[in-house]
From Swiss-Prot:
The keyword Ribosomal protein applies. SUPFAM superfamilies: Glucocorticoid receptor-like (DNA-binding domain) (SSF57716). PANTHER family: 30S RIBOSOMAL PROTEIN S14 (PTHR19836), SMALL RIBOSOMAL SUBUNIT PROTEIN US14M (PTHR19836:SF19). Part of the 30S ribosomal subunit. Contacts proteins S3 and S10. The keyword RNA-binding applies. This is Small ribosomal subunit protein uS14. The lineage of its organism: Bacteria, Pseudomonadati, Pseudomonadota, Betaproteobacteria, Burkholderiales. Keywords: Ribonucleoprotein, Ribosomal protein, RNA-binding, rRNA-binding. InterPro entries: Ribosomal_uS14, Ribosomal_uS14_bac/plastid.
Length: 101
């Protein structure tokens, strides 16, 4: 199990990213728009830099929903590989069977 402080930090990042998502997307689109003047694009980049660092969605980490493990997490299930294995063998994940050939 991951430390609670790390899980709380991740939740804080998610909330902050959700709060600034619209503004972040607008500024990002403006700074990447070739039709805009160089001055407008530079101003958009400056505004992006003024946003909180954790407002960037790239800083979020996918974690296992059960254990909080940051690595080896499958997006499809939101679980770490070890938990997928446990739950699959127990028959708790529908449609997953042990490979046999």
């Amino acid at each position: 199990m991951a430390k609670q402080a790390l899980l709380q930090r991740e939740l804080k990042r998610e909330k902050l990213a959700a709060k600034f998502a619209k503004k972040y997307a607008e500024l990002k689109a403006t700074s990447n728009d070739a039709k805009r003047s160089d001055e407008e694009r530079a101003l958009a980049r400056l505004e992006l830099q003024k946003l909180p660092r954790n407002a960037n969605p790239t800083r979020q980490r996918n974690r296992c929903a059960i254990t909080g493990r940051p690595r080896g997490t499958f997006r499809q299930f939101g679980l770490a590989r070890a938990k997928i294995r446990e739950l699959a063998f127990a028959g708790d994940i529908p449609g997953i069977t042990k490979a046999s050939w």
